[in-house]
Amino acid sequence: MSGLAIDMTGISKAFGPVKALVDADLRVARGTIHGLVGQNGAGKSTIIKVLAGILKPDSGRITINGTRVESLTPASVERLGVHFIHQERLLVPTATVAEAVFLNYELRFGPFLRPGAMKRRAEELIRTHFGLELPGDTLVRDLTTAQQKIVQITRALAQEAQVLVLDEPTAALVKREVDSLFAVLRNLRAQGIAVIFISHYMQEIEDLCDEVTVMRNGTDVGVVRPGETSIDEIVSMMIARDVGEMFPCRSHALGAPVLRVEGLSQAGHFRNVSFEVRAGEVLGITGLLGSGVKELVECLFGLEQPDAGSVTIDGEVRRFANPGRAVQGRVALVPEDRRAHGVATDMSVRDNITIASLERYMTRGFVSRARENEAVDGFIRELSIKTPHRDQLVRNLSGGNQQKVALAKWLSCQSRVYVLDEPTVAVDVGAKVEIYTLLNRLAAEGAAILFLSSDLLEIAGFCDRALVVYRGTLNGEFAGETLDSDLLLAAASGARAQRKEA
């Protein structure tokens, strides 16, 4: 029998004139963790939907655990041992762990449920595979995000899964939870289970995967081993150009200081923080989890109040009692969790873009729909927002396009200061380049940009200067030749405070 758990060969799929897959291959060996990467639109989702039995391919051959299959349905795929762990947590909050594990596969004695047996079996599975003691009567809503992910995986293992497909499984996890999940996946690999790991996080791909299939324009363009191929080389395969071209060059001159922060403090979070951002400048700020960076951002936008210090915008001291006052002061915040706080996913693209600036489109006390539509269409063109029309619900857009909608909202407000919290998180490489280009254009027009990111390569490659926060205080300023990811990491980890100038 072949050593392949999944063998998809020559898979093609078209939707009318659009070719989503063109002679694509995906081969995954048993007992390996196999990465699947590519930009949005590269074909990742389509080939996984074919594997899941959701889409029927136009041509190609599929073999699962040595069995050639002519047609697939979601039910038949599960019977063949292939299970999917989706990015969204599809668990009932009021269910117990045991109920979530055995939903639709309940243990019975004749017509009667066996809740005690299900509880014991769920606890045994979690203990055996993950080394955790998790009571089976715990409610799902009381679990951490990582524990909920474990319950999803346990549900698959209860049905004797031989292949697990995980779609962006770390998107909502903190680093400690990511480390725990990776330990779980490595343990499953040791048990002979094949894992397909889909992620935009290249560092995770490098740390976890044995092999990686890279997709571009609907086909696979190579299978590489992370230990033998660098992240930059993988990204270059994804975007068909050198990774150095990701970050646009800025040639415009910097203007006068727009944002000046002096002696800002908040008990328990940060103290005596001072910096300035000039017109046309992108200032990076980074720090480890718990460093105080998030709380600093909240104070700048009026979500929290500092205990001491001042914020000056264009020479005027401002104190924002709430986010509404910050918006009036022409300060914009694009939050890390865009789906929860950056955009209203059940509203249209148009309504999201204009919600904070409707007064600009008022005529005699009423919103001029024509003026609003004209402005929105302009933003859609300017930002290359991929949407069929302005009335499309934002939830139907990709992550990168949702982020562009969030940025367009503040462009509509004609903001002066942009505070961006992890603006490229869970965004594919192509969309990242588009976001960098947009921010570069904003800077060239005189905006002051505060760019928060935990991706140190991104900070080093995109920003003019960078500040590092360590345990609530600034522990280094870096610019020019010294703006280096290794130096940033050292400062973020508490290395001796230093100040580096260009």
Swiss-Prot record:
Pfam families for this protein: ABC_tran
Known EC number: 7.5.2.7
Catalytic activity, reaction form: D-ribose(out) + ATP + H2O = D-ribose(in) + ADP + phosphate + H(+)
GO molecular function: ABC-type D-ribose transporter activity; ATP binding; ATP hydrolysis activity
Keywords, alphabetical: ATP-binding, Cell inner membrane, Cell membrane, Membrane, Nucleotide-binding, Repeat, Sugar transport, Translocase, Transport
Compartmental location: Cell inner membrane
Binding site for ATP: 38-45
GO annotations of cellular component type: plasma membrane
ATP-binding recorded as keyword: yes
Membrane topology, from the record: Peripheral membrane protein
CDD domains in alphabetical order: ABC_Carb_Monos_I, ABC_Carb_Monos_II
Purpose: Part of the ABC transporter complex RbsABC involved in ribose import. Responsible for energy coupling to the transport system.
Subunit structure: The complex is composed of an ATP-binding protein (RbsA), two transmembrane proteins (RbsC) and a solute-binding protein (RbsB).
Record family assignment: Belongs to the ABC transporter superfamily. Ribose importer (TC 3.A.1.2.1) family.
Protein name per its UniProtKB record: Ribose import ATP-binding protein RbsA
Organism: Cereibacter sphaeroides (strain ATCC 17023 / DSM 158 / JCM 6121 / CCUG 31486 / LMG 2827 / NBRC 12203 / NCIMB 8253 / ATH 2.4.1.)
Chain's gene name: rbsA
